[in-house]
Amino acid sequence: MNPSQILENLKKELSENEYENYLSNLKFNEKQSKADLLVFNAPNELMAKFIQTKYGKKIAHFYEVQSGNKAIINIQAQSAKQSNKSTKIDIAHIKAQSTILNPSFTFESFVVGDSNKYAYGACKAIAHKDKLGKLYNPIFVYGPTGLGKTHLLQAVGNASLEMGKKVIYATSENFINDFTSNLKNGSLDKFHEKYRNCDVLLIDDVQFLGKTDKIQEEFFFIFNEIKNNDGQIIMTSDNPPNMLKGITERLKSRFAHGIIADITPPQLDTKIAIIRKKCEFNDINLSNDIINYIATSLGDNIREIEGIIISLNAYATILGQEITLELAKSVMKDHIKEKKENITIDDILSLVCKEFNIKPSDVKSNKKTQNIVTARRIVIYLARALTALTMPQLANYFEMKDHTAISHNVKKITEMIENDASLKAKIEELKNKILVKSQS
């Protein structure tokens, strides 16, 4: 049996939208395939990883059932050479699909914490339970940039596609450009058909719709049409509806008519979990020291954190060396916020001692009393995260024999953080106090 035919036959097992968005993009690679190995090319690395994980076993099973032969399925990103052979029609198709959902943005890959669990719960509920759509409609998710709003929005889209629903995802910019283009071409009917006749409408950064009254009027009618047809609407924004500038009151009223859920900056434990999830997805192995350093040193923008992880892996691969804490510090030095340059270890020591009611001289001594040892380790941990001091410099500050003693203390406090939720919260609180003080 021709392996390409397997994909065609799989159409019967999947919804039309699911097949068109994912498996229809695969091309059988006959040159690299063997009797027991079937290789398929996906348009990019992201799509390849997603299809391999989600559909690899299904394709293998389907092939075995229909052909009687077993084979390993390998989904890979097509090479640059193969990409260059794309026709103009292919390129036009890619441009037309510029708002396609990111297949890696799923509920399973979203890390849930106190900062986002309400928004996550609401979105997951309506994605899997149609009856809740009438109650939770629209859903309005707001919060600062880079905290996972787009991930959550597209997770709803991907789950809805699997259920065979017609999904439209667009940023406000996409929506405005789409409207403007169709208006110039005299094809507004096409625009209306696209946006009004969908089961799920996902609008990212809805705050930017406030550019013209005409755009808002169009969105108002689309919004009403979808709701009247029992369609689901989910939007994201940087602020809640009542704080949106330039948006008409009637739109604000409709935005606020369903569920309003905020996403706030993640706590330390959630940031650590996010970093681990990103490492797992990108097949990158980082030590606990490095993970904790990234979590405590960077801000809350998840995209920035993922960028650092990928940069670390690139540095290590190109230079042919292991990813160490020192390499992480070197790579991250330009990303760490400038406000941290104002933080000294004396500031950290003073605050920690005040919190634990301990003398600074005791923390800097070699006393082994448990509360003093814990305070000392917290000072070292925060100094590693918030200052540019090296381990030898810290060893000199605490009058320790050498940097290995500092490394030992970092390892111990990291283990304590992982096993003690209250300690995690306390260190996060201390860190925030130090950062706030450095800005004053």
UniProtKB/Swiss-Prot annotation:
One of its GO terms (biological process) is regulation of DNA replication. Residues 74-99 are annotated as: Domain II. One of its GO terms (molecular function) is DNA replication origin binding. Residues 317-440 are annotated as: Domain IV, binds dsDNA. Keywords: ATP-binding, Cytoplasm, DNA replication, DNA-binding, Lipid-binding, Nucleotide-binding. Its main location: cytoplasm. Residues 1-74 are annotated as: Domain I, interacts with DnaA modulators. GO terms for cellular component: cytoplasm; plasma membrane. InterPro entries: AAA+_ATPase, Chromosome_initiator_DnaA, Chromosome_initiator_DnaA-like, Chromosome_initiator_DnaA_CS, DnaA_C, DnaA_dom, DnaA_N_dom, DnaA_N_sf. ATP binds at G146, G148, K149, T150. It is found in: Cytoplasm. It comes from the Bacteria. Residues 100-316 are annotated as: Domain III, AAA+ region. Oligomerizes as a right-handed, spiral filament on DNA at oriC. Plays an essential role in the initiation and regulation of chromosomal replication. ATP-DnaA binds to the origin of replication (oriC) to initiate formation of the DNA replication initiation complex once per cell cycle. Binds the DnaA box (a 9 base pair repeat at the origin) and separates the double-stranded (ds)DNA. Forms a right-handed helical filament on oriC DNA; dsDNA binds to the exterior of the filament while single-stranded (ss)DNA is stabiized in the filament's interior. Domain I is involved in oligomerization and binding regulators, domain II is flexibile and of varying length in different bacteria, domain III forms the AAA+ region, while domain IV binds dsDNA. NCBIfam families: DnaA. Belongs to the DnaA family. This is Chromosomal replication initiator protein DnaA.
